[in-house]
């Protein structure tokens, strides 16, 4: 295993590369340095911006009349429309994905926050269970 010598001072998660620590720190600051040139929406990671920019491409002529999401092919739009058939839907605030249940949205949100193990004593959450256990020893 690689030496993880770069540690976050907020949550004690460790990284083998300084660049990964810097990217991780955006979770705590809420900073979104990657802005869409089409609509101005900000993103924490360049990867999320690239995914978002594909929604602005002109070769996506099929538009959902409920939420505005666009599709390259009609069958993609038709599949998506099923998510609106239930009375309630749960959109992700970070990207434009929509979920038919809050549980599905909560699982998806982990991809944005990279936090999966919450401390029951405070508001901190951790990506790795071992870091949560280490943290819980301070309570």
From Swiss-Prot:
May be involved in transcriptional regulation. It is found in: Nucleus. A zinc finger (C2H2-type) spans 6-28, 34-56, 62-84, 90-112, 117-139. Belongs to the krueppel C2H2-type zinc-finger protein family. It comes from Xenopus laevis. GO terms for cellular component: nucleus. Keywords: DNA-binding, Metal-binding, Nucleus, Repeat, Transcription, Transcription regulation, Zinc, Zinc-finger. This is Gastrula zinc finger protein XlCGF29.1. Pfam families: zf-C2H2 (PF00096). InterPro entries: C2H2-ZF_domain-containing, Znf_C2H2_sf, Znf_C2H2_type. GO terms for molecular function: DNA binding; zinc ion binding.
